[in-house]
From Swiss-Prot:
Similarity comment: Belongs to the chaperonin (HSP60) family.
Matches recorded under Gene3D superfamilies: GroEL (3.50.7.10), GroEL-like equatorial domain (1.10.560.10), TCP-1-like chaperonin intermediate domain (3.30.260.10)
UniProt cross-references to HAMAP family, sorted A to Z: CH60
Organism: Teredinibacter turnerae (strain ATCC 39867 / T7901)
Quaternary context: Forms a cylinder of 14 subunits composed of two heptameric rings stacked back-to-back. Interacts with the co-chaperonin GroES.
Record EC number: 5.6.1.7
GN (gene name): groEL
Reactions catalysed according to its record: ATP + H2O + a folded polypeptide = ADP + phosphate + an unfolded polypeptide
InterPro entries attached to this UniProt entry: Chaperonin_Cpn60_CS (IPR018370), Cpn60/GroEL (IPR001844), Cpn60/GroEL/TCP-1 (IPR002423), GroEL-like_apical_dom_sf (IPR027409), GROEL-like_equatorial_sf (IPR027413), TCP-1-like_intermed_sf (IPR027410)
Protein name, as recorded: Chaperonin GroEL
Binding-site list for ATP: 30-33, 51, 87-91, 415, 495
Keywords recorded for this protein, A-Z: ATP-binding, Chaperone, Cytoplasm, Isomerase, Nucleotide-binding
Length: 546
């Protein structure tokens, strides 16, 4: 085991503080509408330019092990804010830096670190309650666009496209962000349920122009096994032919003579038919077939529930207004399932999302909810260069997280104003002793830091602006983008309450741990001496060779 280096007390805390400040100083330059860019070097390819706090934080590693520990703990603050709310990483970092700096001064002055931490926790909890209670619901397109705009560093195009996407697919819909091919941002919306399986044979194609299968108001047969024997399918085919409607088969697979017979029937016009594989694999495939059954008002033909294909009737088939298939995807529009059944299924899947511990499973379940409840929107990000594309895509993702958070818990005035109002709201808060009250004061002072940093980045005098905002009330604040004072909500400067709350909680938690640190242990740096040069001994007798 390698030897360890141990530092105690003030020595340890000062080293840690250096790391905290290096990381926070790099991150906080990006805060606000006039935040600056940070350029990150990459081992391969062009450097990345970003105004995203967590991207900057993730890049920073310090050579000194003890300083690096401080930096990594603040990085944890940014990551926590990013994971929980998807935004607010820079605000969280600024808050943590302010609490740690003030807190360590108080520890050096002889105050009890544990009492300071209790005071900080008390103030943070009270401020969080204030933020929650002052939040206003965010439901209309305009406020969603404003939240997206602020989070995307005042890019109104991004805010507008996110608001449009949310309007089209609803709050439950899935919105994904992809790299586009043009210069402009584009929005693609798929209504209905889309899944990534295409037609099994090109002979099913009905629209030669775009090489797709399109059937209006078809019957939909759902089977959770392979179909290779045509005899099993005959009763259903005959019933559908009599009804004079098209048939779409969604099964684990259709192969051999069954597929050949379907193709021949289709080409001769005896019955319009098309087939595709069921989406997903294993248990997820069964669940998705069940989703399609509920959406279309049909029944999955499965031997597990005692149903076989030969006994299937028209009652077992689902229906939809339209079913389209391309080579890779299929879309069911306007399934005939009852709204109550679909709602019950959505609630059941939501319960599974709450219970699952796997992020991957939660994401897949959320996709299923979207397919049943809303739709899927894809935002294609356009840019002139690869570097700009990456930077813009990161901002769109940030803005998307922020708007989701706003819809979830409401909005508060932005620009650091809600935290300034929280300071006033907890002005009378006292601890159980002097040191705890000092902890409360530290947290209150720190809550002014985001506003001061936004103003500093805009090139104004922080103390003057902070004093003026403190003197106002309600939503009165300073718009650093235009240099105007006024009502932040009316000026469209909003922050999601969840983002502000998460930033404060993450900062208070990690900063409290740092203030109460008394010892630090790290590996001793190894002395990397060069390889020893072998001595030239044993060659001394060469003189006699002359």
């Amino acid at each position: 085991m390698a030897a360890k280096d141990v530092k105690f007390g003030d020595d340890a805390r000062q080293k840690m503080l250096v790391g905290v400040n290096v990381l926070a100083d790099a991150v906080k330059t990006t805060l606000g509408p006039k935040g600056r860019n940070v350029v990150l070097d990459k081992a391969f390819g062009a450097p990345t330019v970003t105004k995203d706090g967590v991207s900057v934080a993730k890049e920073i590693e310090l050579k000194d092990k003890f300083e690096n520990m401080g930096a990594q703990m603040v990085k944890e603050v940014a990551s926590k804010a990013s994971d929980d709310a998807g935004d607010g990483t820079t605000t969280a970092t600024v808050l943590a830096q302010a609490i740690v700096n003030e807190g360590l001064k108080s520890v050096a002055a002889g105050m009890n670190p544990m009492d300071l931490k209790r005071g900080i926790d008390k103030a943070v909890a009270a401020a969080v309650e204030f933020v929650k209670s002052s939040a206003q619901p965010c439901e209309d397109s305009k406020s969603i666009a404003q939240v997206g705009t602020i989070s995307a560093n005042s890019d109104s195009h991004i805010g507008d496209i996110i608001a449009e996407a949310m309007e089209k697919v609803g709050k439950e819909g899935v919105i994904t962000v992809e790299e586009g091919s043009g210069l402009e941002n584009e929005l693609d919306v798929v209504e209905g349920m889309q899944f990534d399986r295409g037609y099994l044979s090109p002979y099913f194609i009905t629209n030669q122009d775009n090489m797709s299968v399109e059937h209006e108001s078809p019957f939909i047969l759902l089977v959770d096994k392979k179909i290779s024997n045509i005899r099993e399918l005959l009763p259903v085919l005959e019933a559908v032919a009599k009804a004079g409607k098209p048939l779409v088969i969604v099964a684990e697979d259709v192969e051999g003579e069954a597929l050949a017979t379907l193709v021949v029937n289709n080409m001769r016009g005896i019955v319009k038919v098309a087939a595709c594989k069921a989406p997903g694999f294993g248990d997820r495939r069964k669940a998705m077939l069940q989703d399609i059954a509920i959406l279309t008002g049909g029944t999955v033909i499965s031997e597990e529930v005692g149903l076989d294909l030969e006994s299937a009737t028209l009652e077992h088939l689902g229906q939809a207004k339209r079913f389209t298939m391309s080579k890779e995807n299929s879309v069911i529009v306007d399934g005939a399932g009852s709204a109550d059944d679909i709602k019950a299924r959505v609630n059941q899947i939501r319960k599974q999302i709450e219970e699952t511990s796997s992020e991957y499973d939660a994401e897949k379940l959320q996709e299923r909810v979207a397919k049943l409840a809303g739709g899927v929107a894809v935002i294609k990000v356009g840019a002139a260069t690869e570097v700009e594309m990456k930077e813009k895509k990161a901002r769109v993702e940030d803005a998307l997280h922020a708007t989701r958070a706003a819809v979830e818990e409401g909005v508060v005035p932005g620009g650091g104003v809600s935290l300034m109002r929280a300071v006033a709201a907890i002005a009378d808060l006292q601890g159980e002793n002097e040191d705890q009250t000092a902890g409360v004061a530290i947290a209150r002072r720190a809550m002014e830091a985001p506003l001061r940093q936004i103003v500093t980045n805009a090139g104004e005098e922080a103390s003057v602006v902070a004093e003026k905002v403190r003197g106002g009330e309600g939503n009165f604040g300073y718009n650093a983008g235009s240099g105007v004072y006024g009502d932040m909500l009316e000026m469209g400067i909003l922050d999601p309450a969840k983002v502000t709350r998460t930033a404060l909680q993450a900062a208070g938690s990690i900063a409290g741990l740092m203030i109460t640190t008394e010892a630090m242990v790290a590996d001793k740096p190894e002395d990397k001496a060069g390889p020893a040069v072998p001595d030239m001994g044993g060659m001394g007798g060469m003189g006699g060779m002359m």
